[in-house]
């Protein structure tokens, strides 16, 4: 009965990883925008 725990961990990690990728992409976009200025 490890599947419920594993699925819970995966469902908990997916939004965190998506948020991390979104934040890093946003920071890189802002940095590139500042460099273009």
Swiss-Prot record:
Topology relative to the lipid bilayer, per the entry, is:
Single-pass membrane protein
Q: What does this protein do?
A: Component of the cytochrome b6-f complex, which mediates electron transfer between photosystem II (PSII) and photosystem I (PSI), cyclic electron flow around PSI, and state transitions. PetG is required for either the stability or assembly of the cytochrome b6-f complex.
Transmembrane annotation, as ranges? 5-25
Under InterPro entries, the record lists: Cyt_6/f_cplx_su5, Cyt_6/f_cplx_su5_sf
Which cysteine pairs are joined by S-S bonds? none
Q: How does it assemble?
A: The 4 large subunits of the cytochrome b6-f complex are cytochrome b6, subunit IV (17 kDa polypeptide, PetD), cytochrome f and the Rieske protein, while the 4 small subunits are PetG, PetL, PetM and PetN. The complex functions as a dimer.
Predominant cellular place of this UniProt entry's protein? plastid
Q: Which GO molecular function entries does the Swiss-Prot or TrEMBL record give?
A: electron transporter, transferring electrons within cytochrome b6/f complex of photosystem II activity
Q: What protein does this entry describe?
A: Cytochrome b6-f complex subunit 5
Q: Which UniProt keywords apply?
A: Chloroplast, Electron transport, Membrane, Photosynthesis, Plastid, Thylakoid, Transmembrane, Transmembrane helix, Transport
Pfam families, A to Z? PetG
Lineage top rank: taxon? Eukaryota
- Which NCBIfam families does its entry note? PRK00665.1 (NF001907)
Q: What Gene Ontology cellular component terms go with this record?
A: chloroplast thylakoid membrane; cytochrome b6f complex
Signal peptide range in chain numbering: none
* Location(s) in or outside the cell: Plastid, Chloroplast thylakoid membrane
HAMAP family in the cross-refs: Cytb6_f_PetG (MF_00432)
Q: Which family does it belong to?
A: Belongs to the PetG family.
What is one Gene Ontology biological process annotated in the Swiss-Prot or TrEMBL record?
photosynthesis
């Amino acid at each position: 009965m490890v599947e419920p725990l594993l699925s819970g961990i995966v469902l908990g990690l997916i939004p965190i990883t998506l948020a991390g990728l979104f934040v890093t992409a946003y920071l890189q976009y802002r940095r590139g925008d500042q460099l273009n200025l």
